[in-house]
Amino acid sequence: MSPSDVPINWKRNLTVTWLGCFLTGAAFSLVMPFLPLYVEQLGVTGHSALNMWSGLVFSITFLFSAIASPFWGGLADRKGRKIMLLRSALGMAIVMLLMGMAQNIWQFLILRALLGLLGGFIPNANALIATQVPRHKSGWALGTLSTGGVSGALLGPLAGGLLADHYGLRPVFFITASVLFICFLLTFFFIRENFLPVSKKEMLHVREVVASLKNPRLVLSLFVTTLIIQVATGSIAPILTLYVRELAGNVSNIAFISGMIASVPGVAALLSAPRLGKLGDKIGPEKILIVALIISVLLLIPMSFVQTPWQLALLRFLLGAADGALLPAVQTLLVYNSTNQIAGRIFSYNQSFRDIGNVTGPLMGAAISASYGFRAVFCVTAGVVLFNAIYSWNSLRRRRLAIE
């Protein structure tokens, strides 16, 4: 029996990719707490200049990731997903190492852009698992996998802050590079994939990819849903600490309270994603998606009327529980409506929409709060999510009518 005939242990692959997503999520968020401080250390002075450069180095990674994702997705469909995981982990490790050696802000900005170009571990992990797991377990598997990145993103800022306090800013980049190299080694030694490379001539072109989809309009609506999920999440990020300060008044531990309120949605998503993914396998991911979107609207509106930080924390915890179902439901529906032959590109297109949402969300939140105040951000975000719920419901209804 040749190696390619040996059955894939998808459960082991799920465990290893979960660890990889955890390490990648932690690595990305390790440097986030002190990013403005590092920008300042590289010679940027003045309040407005510091704000501008901090925003640039943050957003340029997502911008270049959105541009590069379709290319890497196409290459994954040609060469396999494992090799893309290896490329991403090793590439990001090298870039993080170089970031710790940056001597000026322009070098750092270019390296942040390069990080976006070479990224893509998590969407390729999703594509790998989506093509290996039995279809009736897709929701549970992708929901479980999503908790890896969420867990890493939750622990990363805490670990990054502690490491920066003890060892300084530059060593954290070297530690982050080591974490990503461990991710590379785990992928190299423990993930298995039976993949027959496809020649460039045999690759489906974009039109053929669209034609091969079971429901192209529904897939587009799922991409838009991914974008709006990230816009809704990102729109609140720039104003959260200031809003908490407005609610809390003059307290000494505002940083702790803000950090706790920022992290509770992630904790809730961590708890809810596998369970709601499993429920989606039973009743259908489309029902989970629509209900979670409606619940999100109903939770966002009262956030604009809260009077204490703890009321906001409770609502954000419940919002996180609902949000934990959204991306896994979208990904499961993408699996149902595409073939393994194009999975890499479909998940990479979805990642591009996610990255665009990561860039536009904070810009939208900052613009609305500057013109209308903090509370207006929650109302506008609720309106955007409500539009998406109606749009998604209409797309899913058309699909159901077409089937009937």
UniProtKB/Swiss-Prot annotation:
CDD domains: MFS_MdtG_MDR_like. Keywords: Cell inner membrane, Cell membrane, Membrane, Transmembrane, Transmembrane helix, Transport. The chain crosses the membrane at residues 19-39, 56-76, 90-110, 113-133, 144-164, 171-191, 222-242, 254-274, 288-308, 317-337, 376-396. It comes from the Bacteria. One of its GO terms (molecular function) is transmembrane transporter activity. It holds the Pfam family MFS_1. It is found in: Cell inner membrane. It is a multi-pass membrane protein. Its main location: membrane. The keyword Cell membrane applies. One of its GO terms (cellular component) is plasma membrane. Gene3D superfamilies: MFS general substrate transporter like domains. HAMAP family: MFS_MdtG. Belongs to the major facilitator superfamily. DHA1 family. MdtG (TC 2.A.1.2.20) subfamily. This is Multidrug resistance protein MdtG. It comes from Salmonella schwarzengrund (strain CVM19633). The gene is mdtG.
